[in-house]
Amino acid sequence: MTHLQFDNRLRAQLPGDPEQGPRRREVLAAWSAVRPTPVAAPTLLAYSADVAQRLGLRAEDLASPQFAEVFGGNALYPGMQPWAVNYGGHQFGHWAGQLGDGRAISLGEAIGVDGGRYELQLKGAGPTPYSRGADGRAVLRSSIREFLCSEAMHYLGVPTTRALSLVGTGDAVVRDMFYDGHPRREPGAIVCRVAPSFIRFGNFELPAARGDVDLLRQWVDFTLARDFPDLPGSGEDRIAAWFGQVCERTAVMVAHWMRVGFVHGVMNTDNMSILGLTIDYGPYGWVDDYDPDWTPNTTDAQGRRYRFGTQPQVAYWNLGRLAQALSPLFGDAASLQAGLDQFRDTYLACDRRDTAAKLGLAECQDEDLHLIDDLRALMREAEMDMTLTFRGLVDLSPQQPDASVLREAFYDETKRAAQAPALGAWLQRYAARCLQDGASDAVRASRMRAANPRYVLRNYLAQQAIDQAEQGDLSGVHALLEVMQRPYDDQPRRESFAAKRPDWARDRAGCSMLSCSS
């Protein structure tokens, strides 16, 4: 028996669906009561010791058969009251109507050892009223990716939901990975996601689109009371201040994505958190050879709406949809524009901060924005690895700038040779700027190591771990989890995890591009 304590405020304070169970239906309430569907043989495959500790879970709790039963969807701890939440959203720029938690079921809101709130949510636990004809299950492949990325992003310093556990179900799930008419049976799994709140932009968009101002106001009042209790003011002013905070947090989150080279892949408004947390890890990826037009999502391959370089603009557009949803609560919605302006100001400030940090400078001058933009253009032309380029610059001597520090970063020798003169000229400019900055080599290197990770969860690394896990070997998952807990450190005997994408992975499924199939 664990010592978890639950208060489940969302279920207690927002109107629920009068019908229980997973029957697909239109729901006019905030949430629906639904239990996870049992699985054949739940087995704990991996867990986050840090998240477990925050929840007050002990080693004997994690080792007990009951833990796998609960987080595999077969049982409940006392105090758990499972539900699925109703929301809508804009998908690829178009209103999609009711969406909701199609395969995510929240078990409850636990109070952690720090007094904080931790909503525990199973992904892949079976059908809900929002499953839209799907089975509500998840495959091991996508579950490993979500589990590892949730934790990797946390240790990179990127605002994110967390993952407590990865449980194998013992059941097979049929999926058509690339929607090309070739479905196959894959092992099933369930991830327990953890966050103070899973409320999304779409929770406000759906009642607004339906003209249900009462439910919209209930969502806003609940969110302010539970998740933003310290916001001063009242009425429209308080809602506008809250929207400003959502805009600010979203800007900080996306700036971190751009700093570490992360591409979300599916920035629909139903995948946007009101806490500014990265949420819903599907066909995500990290930029290998630098390309601002790259997207890892096969569904977005033609339009590339959610490509790496447009993520800040998409976030701004999504916030505009949230502002539109909130506008019925305002006599004059013009006050919401201040929040959108706050997004721009915050993002630009974060970008300047990150530019200075990535280049190892004390502060960002206007010329430094041109300097880093010119480096990005060079990386694109020379097909250079983003992570290895910035990490390689740590070892540059401003007194004797030598391009050999970047030798690991190139994917194409012909392009390297063609761009060598331009790169040499850029290194001279950068070296002069470092000397002007005046910091010692040690100080500059320390700044850069704190901003430029050595290790990121490259798709090919995750795919290698998945291949092993599908054969029953979890060692790759455990090794990646361990390495990604120290992404900014040089880890002896772990150099292979920092290597650029190998040639075999350039076009392999799961290593270059992915679908939403999971």
Curated annotation (Swiss-Prot):
A Pfam family this chain is assigned to: SelO
Enzyme class, broadest EC rank: transferase
Cofactors demanded by this protein: Mg(2+); Mn(2+)
Record carries keyword Zinc: no
Family (UniProt): Belongs to the SELO family.
UniProt protein name: Protein nucleotidyltransferase YdiU
Active site, renumbered: D270
EC number: 2.7.7.-, 2.7.7.108
Binding site for ATP: G100, G102, R103, K123, D135, G136, R193, R200, D280
